[in-house]
Swiss-Prot record:
Summary of the function given for this chain in its UniProt record: Catalyzes the reversible transfer of the terminal phosphate group between ATP and AMP. Plays an important role in cellular energy homeostasis and in adenine nucleotide metabolism.
Organism (species): Parabacteroides distasonis (strain ATCC 8503 / DSM 20701 / CIP 104284 / JCM 5825 / NCTC 11152)
A GO molecular-function annotation: adenylate kinase activity
Gene behind the chain: adk
Lineage, opening ranks: Bacteria, Pseudomonadati, Bacteroidota, Bacteroidia, Bacteroidales
Name recorded for this polypeptide: Adenylate kinase
Keywords: ATP-binding, Cytoplasm, Kinase, Nucleotide biosynthesis, Nucleotide-binding, Transferase
Keyword Cytoplasm set for record: yes
Entry remark concerning the domains of this protein: Consists of three domains, a large central CORE domain and two small peripheral domains, NMPbind and LID, which undergo movements during catalysis. The LID domain closes over the site of phosphoryl transfer upon ATP binding. Assembling and dissambling the active center during each catalytic cycle provides an effective means to prevent ATP hydrolysis.
Length: 190
């Protein structure tokens, strides 16, 4: 099974490249946000617990998210593998994901780290804000999101370096050029 974690700062192209990876390799897409919303909407036991945390303005605990992801994996039984979108974001989440996957006889195959210069990230996000109308794509919010990424999320790359799973992908250039680099990295893992 090919299990991919796609990683990068806001605006690095994770969504765009995820779609291409899914098509190219026939992977199932697991978006943590979608899973969380789905569990809450279906009013599952885990969904009710998560909703309680969210309504109190608290973060949903890692264990709960991992349990939800485990349920999705167990129900989907992906034949070729999975691309994880939005998870893990911290080292404890990465360790919990590894444990859960190991219990199912698999592991993360590769962590693709899309690396884009900060000026380019800001440019892309401001442009996306104009096109999509996303209210969180304004300069002040963008800078705040990038700060959070650098302080809280970026250290996760070092964890995957230690695991021998990290591949830095130059995220500059055309969509096709970037995807070419991704394919080269993934094909070396398969």
């Amino acid at each position: 099974m090919l299990n991919v974690v796609i990683f990068g700062a806001p605006g690095s192209g994770k969504g765009t490249q995820s779609e291409l990876i899914i098509k190219e390799y026939g992977l199932d897409h697991i978006s943590t946000g979608d899973v969380l919303r789905g569990e809450m909407k279906a009013e599952t036991e885990l969904g009710k617990i998560a909703k309680d945390y969210i309504e109190k303005g608290q973060l949903v605990p890692d264990e709960l998210i991992v349990d939800m992801l485990a349920n999705v994996l167990d129900s989907k039984k992906p034949a070729k593998g999975v691309i994880f979108d939005g998870f893990p974001r911290t080292i404890p989440q990465a360790k919990a994901l590894k444990k859960m996957l190991n219990e199912r006889g698999t592991d993360v195959s590769v962590m693709l780290n899309l690396q884009v210069e900060e000026e380019e990230l800001i440019k892309r996000l401001l442009e996306r804000g104009k096109v999509s109308g996303r209210s969180d794509d304004n300069l002040e919010t963008i800078k705040s999101r990038l700060d959070v990424y650098h302080t809280q999320t970026a250290p996760l790359a070092d964890y995957y370096v230690g695991e021998g799973k990290h591949v830095a992908i130059k995220g500059m250039g055309t969509i096709e050029e970037i995807f070419g680099r991704i394919k080269e990295a993934v094909n070396n893992v398969k």
